[in-house]
Amino acid sequence: MAPNLRKSHPLLKMINNSLIDLPTPPNISAWWNFGSLLGICLMTQILTGLLLAMHYTADTTLAFSSVAHTCRNVQYGWLIRNLHANGASFFFICIYLHIGRGFYYGSYLYKETWNTGVILLLTLMATAFVGYVLPWGQMSFWGATVITNLFSAIPYIGQTLVEWAWGGFSVDNPTLTRFFALHFLLPFMIAGLTLVHLTFLHESGSNNPLGIVSNCDKIPFHPYFTLKDILGFTLMLLPLTTLALFSPNLLGDPENFTPANPLVTPPHIKPEWYFLFAYAILRSIPNKLGGVLALAASVLILFLAPFLHKAKQRTMTFRPLSQLLFWILVANLFILTWVGSQPVEHPFIIIGQLASFTYFTILLILFPIIGALENKMLNY
C-alpha cells in the first residue's frame, strides 16, 4: 500500500500534526476558539494592509490625501480601509478574551506558551500604535507625539532616545516614514512569533476547562474542531463586516478627519479604545517616570501570572472566590477603559487612581491570597 502523503511528506506532515491529526481535549469550550480567530484576524489584517500599502504614500505632505484618495478613487478602497481599521479592534477584542480565558483556566502554567503570548501582545500593541500614526490626522500626530515623548522619562538617555526615535527634534517626515516601515514589518514578526507560540503549545497539548490531564480522552482536531473554528470565523466576520459597512467610524476619533497640524493641539488627546485601560493607569500617577513605569507594569505584570498561582487546582472552574475576584478584575478593567476616555478632571482623576490601585492589588496581592485560602478550605 502506498504511504499516505499527508503523513509522510516532510511539510504536509507538520501541517497534519498541527491542524488535522492533532490530539485535542474533547471538552474545550468556545473560549478555546479565540486562538484561531486571532489567526484569521492576522491574515485579514496582512491582506488588507498590503492592499492599502499599495496606495499609501509615507510622506507628511501626502499621507492624509493618499488615504483619502484610497477611499474615494480605488476600487473598494473604502471597504479595504474600513475592514483594516475595524479589524484592528476585533484583533484586540479577540486577544483580550484569549488572555482572559488563559487567566481564568490557568493556561499560564504552560510558561513558554504564555510568555510568547505576552510578547505577541506587546508586538501587537506596537503595531497598532505605529499604524494609527499613518493616516497623519490630528490624533495620529498628537498621539505619536505624546506616546513617544514618554521615553524621555527614562533617566539620562531619555531625551536622546526620543530624538533618535523621531529622527529629528519633533514628530515629522522621518518619524512617519520609519513608522510605516515598522508597521509593514511587525505583522510578519507577529506571524513568526505565532508559529513559536503554537510550537510551544503543541509540546504540551491544549489545556481544558477542568484543568486535568486529558490524554486518555483526546479526539482528532479535524473534523471536530475545524468545523467549530469555521463557525467561530463566521460569528466574528459577521459583526466585523457589519461594523465596517454600517458604522465604520464608530470606534475612531473625529479629530483624525483633520490633517495633522503641529500648531493646534486637540482639546482631548486619547488613544484608540483598546489602549484606554493602560492610558488611564499612565494618567493616574502625577509623576512622569512613575506613570511610564505603571503603564509598562500594567502589561508586563502578565509575565508574573505563573508565579502568582498558589492554588492547588489549575482552573477557576471549582474556585468560587477566585471567580468572584476574576470578574471584579474584569469590571475594574472596564472602569479603567471608561476613565481613560474622560477628561483629566474631578471625579475622573480619583476614580482612575482607585481603579489603577485596585488593578495591581487584585493581581499581585489578592489572587495569591485567595488561592492559598481556597487550598485551606479544601481541607475542611
UniProtKB/Swiss-Prot annotation:
Residues binding heme b b562, per UniProt: 84, 183
Matches recorded under CDD domains: cytochrome_b_C, Cytochrome_b_N
Subcellular location: Mitochondrion inner membrane
Keyword Transferase: no
Positions that bind heme b b566: 98, 197
Membrane-related topology note: Multi-pass membrane protein
Protein name listed in UniProt: Cytochrome b
Homology family: Belongs to the cytochrome b family.
